[in-house]
C-alpha cells in the first residue's frame, strides 16, 4: 500500500490518506486498484472499526483516470472490461462496509476522484475555489466509468444529474452544496478530518447507501414518472440538436442514466462499464483527449513558448478603430491593459470605444456585469488621434485596412511610440509579415498578431513570425496573448499564413460544389452534417464576397511588385468563377444587402434563387462525398501547411483549426482527423476524391509518409 497511508485512531476511525508516489496528483493509474483492494481487505478485517475517512496528501483530492492509459486503449475487449470492473469493485466494497465512510475533499475531486466521493456516505469539502467537484468526462469524449453516471443519477435524480453529466460542469463548494454534490463545507484545511470524524461519531449507523436501502426511490421520480419521461424526450431532442449525432459520449451517458433507473444497481454498473470501454477505444475520445486536454495543457503551460522570463505589457496602442481595432481594445480593457485607441478622427476613435460600451451594456442587462465593472472596463480605453509620447507604449497593434501601402505608412509613422522593450504587431490576415517589417527600423521587434472577428468571442490569436522576428519578440507576443486571456497559435510567415489559407479552401469547396451542380441547400446541409458551425455559403456572406476579392487583388498586386508568382489561392478557382460575377451583380454579401442569401428587414435569410446559374455540372453528388470534400479539403491544406513549415506543431494545427476556423471539434482538429481516420485510409480516400473531383485533393505520397513518420516518432 505504498500509495495509501493507513492510520487508525483510538475511536476506531481509520483515515486513509491517498499519496500516489512519484506523482503531483492522485490518479486512477495501474497501481490504484491493487492498492485500493489492499485497503479494502484491511478495512474489512479491521477489528473495532467504527468509520473510515478518505483524504489526500496532495494539493488536490483526486484527479481521476490516467488519460495516457486511455489513449493507449485500441479495442473494447474483455481485458479492458475486467480492468474497469476491478476498479469499480473496490468502490462497491467501500459502500458495503458496515461503518460510515466520509470523503474529506481538500482540493479538486474530478472524474474518478469524485466517483470515489459518491461511493462514500458523506462528503465534506474545503471552502476553496480550487476545491471543485464534478464529472468532466464528457468533455473528453468519455462517460464517468467508475459508477459516476449510475450513482449521480440515483443521488440527484435524472434531471439534475444530467446537467452535470452532459455538460461536464465543475462546481465550487457553495454550488456543490446547493445542488447536493457534497454534504458539508469547512473553512480551514485543518478542520476537514476532524469534521469527518465528528460526523462519523454522530452518525454511526449511516453506512447504507440510499440505493441499497429497501424501497429506494429516485429523486424526482423513476423512468416511468411523467415528468421524468418528459425530461428524457426533451433531453434526447436537445442533445441531437447540439451534437448532430457526431459525439457518441453524450448519447451513451443519457442511455446509461435512463436505463440505470430500470434495472438493479449492480447490473447498471456493468452496463456503464460496457459503454465506457466502447468510448475508450473511440476516435472521438482520442481526439478530445489529445487535443482538448493535452494540447490545451501544452499551450497554457508555455511548453510551446520560447524560454525566458514572463513578460507583461503595461500599456498598449491600437491603431484603427474599426470592428477589429475596437474588438482588440475591448479585449485589452477586459484584461485591465490600458489602451490608446487611435484613429484619424477623434469621433471614429470614440465610436470604437462605444463598441466596448455596447458590449458592457449587454453584459449588465444579462446580469453578468455590475455597472461599476462597466465603468472600470471603459476607463482602460482612451480614444485618441496622433501618436502617444515617444517610447511610452509596450505594445502597438496596427489594425487598419488590409492595404499594404497604408499599413507600411502607419507602421513607419507610429513606430516611435514603442517603449525600448516593446513590440509591434500587425493585425493582418494575409499580408506577409516579412514585407511589412521592412517599413520599421527594427524588424526583429515586429510580429504578426492576427485576431479573428468578432474579437470578443473568438479568443484565439495567430502569431506570425517574420523572417527577422526575434525569439524574444515571439516570447513577448506569446505572453501578451495569454495576458489578455486568448490562445496563442504560432505560425511562420507565408501568404495567407495558416488560418486564411485553410478557411479559403472551405469557402471555395462550397463554391465548387455549387459549380458541380449540387443544390445550395444541400451544400449547407452537408457542412452541418460534417460538423461545421455554419455552411460555406453563409460564411461567405458574413465575411463578404468583396473582401475576398480585395484580398486576391492585393496579393496579385504584391506579386507584381515583387516580380513573383506566389500561387496564393491557386486551387480556389471556383471562388473566382462564382463570386466575381455575383459582385458585378451587386451581391457582395450580407452587409451589401445580399450575396448567396437574400435578407429581409428582420435579417431572415433565404438562399438566392439565382445561384442555379452557376451550376456547370449535373452530377448527383452523394451527400457523403460532399461531407468528405468539405472536411478533406481543409485537412489537406492544413497538412500542406504543416509539411511546408508554416505550422510548427500538430497541437497548434488542431487547436487553431477548431477555434479560429471552426473545423469540427469532434474530430480533434484537422491533423487529428487524419490520424483518426488512419493516415493510409485518409490518403486512399483523398485519392478517390482527386480522381472524381479534381487535383486539389491530390497530395504527394511523400507528405503522407512524413506524417506517418512523425506519428511513429511520437509513439
Regions found by a protein language model. Name each.
Residues 1-55, 92:
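Conserved CoA-thioester-binding segment of acyl-CoA-metabolizing enzymes
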Residues 2-9, 19, 74, 81-85, ...:
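N-terminal glycine-rich phosphate-binding loop for ADP-containing cofactors
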Residues 31, 45, 58-72, 91:
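Amphipathic alpha-helical interaction surfaces in cytosolic regulatory modules
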Residues 59-63, 110-111, 431-432:
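Short, active-site-adjacent cap segments at secondary-structure transitions
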Residues 69-93:
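Extended, non-globular alpha-helical segments
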Residues 103, 107-113:
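Gly/Ser-rich catalytic serine loop of serine hydrolases
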Amino acid at each position: 500500500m505504498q500509495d495509501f497511508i493507513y492510520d487508525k485512531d483510538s475511536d476506531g476511525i481509520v483515515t486513509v490518506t491517498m499519496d500516489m508516489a512519484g506523482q503531483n496528483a492522485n490518479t486512477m493509474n495501474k497501481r490504484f486498484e491493487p492498492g485500493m483492494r489492499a485497503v479494502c481487505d484491511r478495512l474489512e478485517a479491521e477489528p473495532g472499526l467504527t468509520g473510515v475517512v478518505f483524504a489526500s496528501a496532495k494539493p488536490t483530492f483526486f484527479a481521476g483516470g490516467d488519460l495516457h492509459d486511455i489513449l493507449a486503449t485500441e479495442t473494447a475487449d474483455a481485458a479492458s472490461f475486467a480492468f474497469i470492473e476491478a476498479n469499480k469493485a473496490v468502490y462497491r466494497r467501500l459502500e458495503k462496509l458496515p461503518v460510515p465512510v466520509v470523503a474529506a475533499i481538500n482540493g479538486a475531486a474530478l472524474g474518478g476522484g469524485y466517483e470515489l466521493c459518491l461511493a462514500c456516505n458523506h462528503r465534506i469539502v474545503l471552502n476553496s475555489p480550487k476545491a471543485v467537484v464534478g464529472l468532466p468526462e464528457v468533455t473528453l469524449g468519455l462517460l464517468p466509468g467508475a459508477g459516476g453516471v449510475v450513482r449521480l443519477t440515483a443521488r440527484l435524480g435524472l434531471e439534475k444529474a444530467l446537467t452535470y453529466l452532459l455538460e461536464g460542469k465543475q462546481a465550487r463548494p457553495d454550488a456543490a452544496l446547493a445542488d447536493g454534490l457534497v454534504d458539508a463545507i469547512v473553512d480551514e484545511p485543518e478542520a476537514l478530518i476532524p469534521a469527518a470524524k465528528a460526523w462519523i461519531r454522530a452518525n454511526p449507523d449511516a453506512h447504507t447507501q440510499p440505493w441499497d436501502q429497501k424501497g429506494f426511490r429516485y429523486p424526482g421520480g423513476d423512468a416511468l414518472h411523467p415528468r421524468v419521461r418528459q425530461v428524457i424526450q426533451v433531453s434526447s431532442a436537445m442533445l441531437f440538436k447540439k451534437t448532430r449525432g457526431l459525439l457518441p459520449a453524450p448519447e451513451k451517458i443519457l442511455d446509461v442514466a435512463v436505463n440505470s433507473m430500470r434495472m438493479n444497481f449492480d447490473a447498471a454498473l456493468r452496463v456503464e462499464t460496457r459503454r465506457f470501454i466502447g468510448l475508450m477505444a473511440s476516435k472521438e475520445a482520442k481526439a478530445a483527449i489529445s487535443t482538448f486536454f493535452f494540447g490545451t495543457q501544452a499551450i497554457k503551460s508555455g511548453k510551446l513558448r520560447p524560454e525566458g522570463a514572463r513578460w507583461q505589457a503595461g500599456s498598449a496602442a491600437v491603431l484603427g478603430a474599426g470592428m477589429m481595432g475596437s474588438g482588440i481594445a475591448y479585449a485589452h480593457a477586459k484584461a485591465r491593459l490600458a489602451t490608446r485607441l487611435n484613429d484619424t478622427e477623434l469621433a471614429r476613435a470614440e465610436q470604437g470605444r462605444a463598441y466596448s460600451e455596447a458590449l458592457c451594456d449587454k453584459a449588465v442587462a444579462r446580469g453578468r456585469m455590475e455597472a461599476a465593472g462597466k465603468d472600470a472596463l471603459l476607463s482602460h480605453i482612451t480614444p485618441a488621434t496622433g501618436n502617444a509620447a515617444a517610447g511610452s507604449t509596450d505594445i502597438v497593434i496596427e489594425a487598419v485596412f488590409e492595404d499594404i501601402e497604408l499599413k507600411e505608412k502607419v507602421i513607419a509613422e507610429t513606430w516611435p511610440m514603442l517603449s525600448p522593450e516593446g513590440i509591434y504587431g500587425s493585425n493582418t490576415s494575409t499580408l506577409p509579415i516579412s514585407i511589412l517589417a521592412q517599413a520599421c527600423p527594427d524588424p526583429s521587434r515586429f510580429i504578426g498578431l492576427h485576431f479573428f472577428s468578432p474579437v470578443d468571442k473568438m479568443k484565439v490569436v495567430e502569431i506570425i513570425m517574420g523572417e527577422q522576428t526575434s525569439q524574444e519578440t515571439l516570447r513577448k507576443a506569446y505572453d501578451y496573448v495569454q495576458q489578455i486571456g486568448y490562445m496563442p497559435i504560432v505560425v511562420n510567415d507565408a501568404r495567407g499564413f495558416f488560418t486564411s489559407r485553410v478557411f479559403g479552401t472551405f469557402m471555395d469547396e462550397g463554391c465548387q460544389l455549387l459549380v458541380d451542380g449540387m443544390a445550395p441547400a444541400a451544400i449547407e446541409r452537408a457542412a452541418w452534417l460534417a460538423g461545421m458551425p455554419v455552411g460555406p455559403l453563409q460564411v461567405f456572406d458574413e465575411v463578404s464576397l468583396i473582401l475576398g476579392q480585395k484580398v486576391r487583388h492585393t496579393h496579385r498586386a504584391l506579386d507584381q511588385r515583387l516580380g513573383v508568382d506566389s500561387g496564393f489561392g491557386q486551387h480556389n478557382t471556383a471562388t473566382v468563377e462564382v463570386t466575381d460575377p455575383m459582385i458585378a451583380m451587386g451581391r457582395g454579401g450580407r452587409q451589401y444587402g445580399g450575396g448567396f442569401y437574400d435578407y429581409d428587414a428582420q435579417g431572415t435569410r433565404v438562399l438566392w434563387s439565382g445561384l442555379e446559374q452557376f451550376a456547370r455540372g449535373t452530377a448527383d453528388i452523394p451527400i457523403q462525398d460532399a461531407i468528405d470534400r468539405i472536411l478533406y479539403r481543409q485537412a489537406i491544406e492544413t497538412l500542406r501547411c504543416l509539411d511546408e513549415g508554416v505550422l510548427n506543431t500538430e497541437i497548434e494545427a488542431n487547436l487553431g483549426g477548431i477555434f479560429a476556423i471552426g473545423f469540427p471539434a469532434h474530430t480533434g482538429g484537422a491533423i487529428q482527423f487524419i490520424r483518426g481516420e488512419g493516415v493510409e485510409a485518409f490518403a486512399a480516400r483523398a485519392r478517390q476524391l482527386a480522381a472524381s473531383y479534381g487535383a486539389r485533393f491530390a497530395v504527394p505520397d511523400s507528405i503522407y509518409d512524413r506524417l506517418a513518420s512523425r506519428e511513429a516518432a511520437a509513439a
